[in-house]
Curated annotation (Swiss-Prot):
Catalyzes the addition of meso-diaminopimelic acid to the nucleotide precursor UDP-N-acetylmuramoyl-L-alanyl-D-glutamate (UMAG) in the biosynthesis of bacterial cell-wall peptidoglycan. It comes from Aquifex aeolicus (strain VF5). This is UDP-N-acetylmuramoyl-L-alanyl-D-glutamate--2,6-diaminopimelate ligase. Its EC number is 6.3.2.13. ATP binds at G108, T109, N110, G111, K112, T113, T114. Belongs to the MurCDEF family. MurE subfamily. The keyword RNA-binding does not apply. Meso-2,6-diaminopimelate binds at R372, D396, N397, P398, R399, G447, E451.
Amino acid sequence: MGSNPTPSASVLYMDLSFILKRVKGITLNSKEVKKGYLFFAIKGTRFDGHNFIREAEERGAYAVVVERPVSSKVPVIIVEDTRKALGKSAHEFFGKPSERLNVIGITGTNGKTTTTHLIEKILLEAGEKTGLIGTIYYRLGEKILGSGRTTPDQITWHRTLKEFYELGAKNVVAEISSHALDQYRVYPTRFEAVLFTNLSQDHLDYHKTMEDYFASKAKLFTEYESKVKIINADDTYGKRLLKITHGEIITYGKKGDLKILNFRTDFRGSALRIAFKGKEYEFSTNLIGDFQAYNLSAAIAYALWKGIEPDLIQRALKCVNVPGRFEVVHSDKFTVIIDYAHTPDAVENVLRTARKLSKGKLISVFGAGGNRDREKRPLMGKAAEKYSDLIILTSDNPRDEEPEKIIEDILDGISEKDKVIIEADRRKAIKKAIDMAKEGDMVAILGKGHEDYQEIKGVKYPFSDAQVVKEILGGDGCIGKD
């Protein structure tokens, strides 16, 4: 971009397009400001960027974008919403990349990661280079471009889309979190398709109420352009979404446009029979779990809408690996399941399937994240009690909270306290579960899935459930990468 000298300080109300042609970069982090950069003052949950304008000036900011009048030595551009202004500016600064790509956005409480991987696999099978943005990583083929938040900030989002485009991608499939929608992190992306999986309790530490949570999710369907909207018609909030969204809509579920006729699952995988536009199709996959019926249906609905042949869809679904999602570890006598389930609904879904597949007892090991929604903790305990013969409560990512206090919150939802063992050390808890497992039993380790760290008091220590299980089982364990 241009290298014009910084103009004299003034308060401006103008189209940011004029300024964007004259700056070298844009940022919302005052510590990243360089000479000639445009700084956006964002008011966050912990910090207010308006308090860091002086630092941005000292680092050479060309101008600052704010929501309220401030004293500054550089031009001040006042806008109604700096988050939206940042999104629009990043979109323009990086060449409007979403207009050159087919961007598929997926939102919902559970199923986002699996559904993004399914759609990515289908598009790759169709010969279309496809990027993925999500909880585990941001990647294009084998190239990992980054990781962090499920959905990155506005600058990272639009810059990543640009990188995908420059690397030859035709499509990008992305998880869109409720936080991202509330904070306009993907604004003003033009989507090819947007998908809704489901909504159940999570993130109430941030959204406060389920109504606020739903309102954030709904933004993807009411405030963004998309060619098609694909919605779970069996979900209560999905039905509500149908009443407020417009344009081309495809529903999926037992009563959807894409109708689930039959689904069966066991340790060999799953089979799904559906009806869509007067035709019946059957698909099989290595993925396990009753909940996969909806993840598969969402991905198939998109693929059929796009005109991808059913035979090609089947080839893609035959073997899918989603790290930390119902990951099966086989030993000589029993089975271990590793899953990211960290909401009441996800815990119930995973343990219901585990109960169904287990020939013996079901031992569950889990905790809950610190500094997050406390209300869901007893509900997770209640869900675990419903299906488990034995529950070992332990730490997840306690963050700044004491693990014992989190465990107490979970314990409040469990009535049969005699089926509970408390072991705050997660490694010891996993070992205890494996040591107690007998032939035919199943051990379900929930909450962290693919994560390779445990966050305690601001420090992320190396920790992987899969690695710990492998170390404990030694040569007896085989982690399936189905």
